Amino acid sequence: PIVSKMALLDDNLSKALKLLADVPLIDGHNDFPYFIRGWFPEQIDSLDCRNVRIAHTDLERLNQGRVGGVFWSAYVPCPDRHAKNDFVVDAQYESLRATMQQIDIIHTLIERYSDRLGLARTSSEVWEVFRSGRIASLIGVEGLHQIANSPGVMRNLYRLGVRYITLTHDSNNLYADSTNSSGPFHGGLSRDGISIVKEMNRIGMMVDLSHTSVATQKHVLAISKAPVIFSHSSCASVTEHPRNSPDDVLDMLKANGGVFMITFIRKPTDAESPTLEKVADHVQHVGDRIGYEHVGIGSDFDGVMLTASGLDDVSKFPLLIAELLKRGVSDHSIKNMIGLNVLRVMDSVEEVSMKMKETGEEMLHEVFEEIWDEKMRDEVRKTRDIFD
């Protein structure tokens, strides 16, 4: 069990468990599917996901942690050529193939453990799965390199259940600059990036700004018609780190209506002492700065070797909630943070999508590689007796 019998008597922990029974705790980012790919490359069919002690995540500990929903990340690494700002599509086909494999792993887990997990694509489906006693399973993609420069691929990812895409991972791409790269290339969003954000708004795909440069974050927050998320990020005012966002970005996020989901990654949490308490500091900073209706949790479990101490695996979420209650954070604010905020954003993103489609917003087209030459076109005209 996650706590001793004596600890269960603690008022804050008891209250935390009650709150987690009322509202689904939705983790904005979990990399267990990629851990499966790395640790069990030839054993996926026989893997027992109820107990995987080598990982941060398994079904038993998700239950112990009272997790109500997870955005499973269909992450794959950036192509090597992206490090040189070479975004040629040929380098991304392997990323696309691996992305489809990762989405297959996620769907396979949901199907195999249908008594524990349920696919969720909308807020209503999250509630339906949660109230059935299962964990709502949502899908995120961690980088636009995974769409192989194709809006059509992105639309198909949405059809497969993907509900957010992080604009970048560790490298710049065709669309945007990353904070982890050697330096800016576009100065924020590129022209293609502006178009892809608009298309994400149109189809109802949440924009995720974790990993992006501050310039990219500000650019998106200035143009997005829908609220955005930071699926796993931290605050620069609490800890200086390249991945952490400054207060002026948080202020723009408040105006946008989005959610900043605090991560458990050690260095962004605190270079010297990354602890549960320090994670709580980041949560409180967002809450105090822009309101608890704009903060969430995005652990990055199984995306890093170690997380903040005290938050060592998915069973430990109640301890963070108890710490925040101890600090005086209200029940209402806790409920917003653990799940209601991201569910609100999901609803808002859908509403924006519906309005854009109703007003005839044009889809983002792409130019296909030519497959017919003029000789072939002439043959079609001749055969069908149709001439210009």
Curated annotation (Swiss-Prot):
SUPFAM superfamilies in alphabetical order: Metallo-dependent hydrolases
Inducing factors: Expression is regulated by the cluster-specific regulator verZ.
Top EC category: hydrolase
S-S bridge residues: none
E.C. number(s) listed in UniProt: 3.4.13.19
Swiss-Prot/TrEMBL catalytic activity: an L-aminoacyl-L-amino acid + H2O = 2 an L-alpha-amino acid
Annotated metabolic or biological route of this protein: Mycotoxin biosynthesis
Deleted gene: phenotype: Completely abolishes the 11'-deoxyverticillin A production.
Cofactor: Zn(2+)
A single BP term in Gene Ontology: proteolysis
Xref: InterPro entries: Metal_Hydrolase, Pept_M19
Name of the featured protein: Dipeptidase verJ
Species of origin: Clonostachys rogersoniana
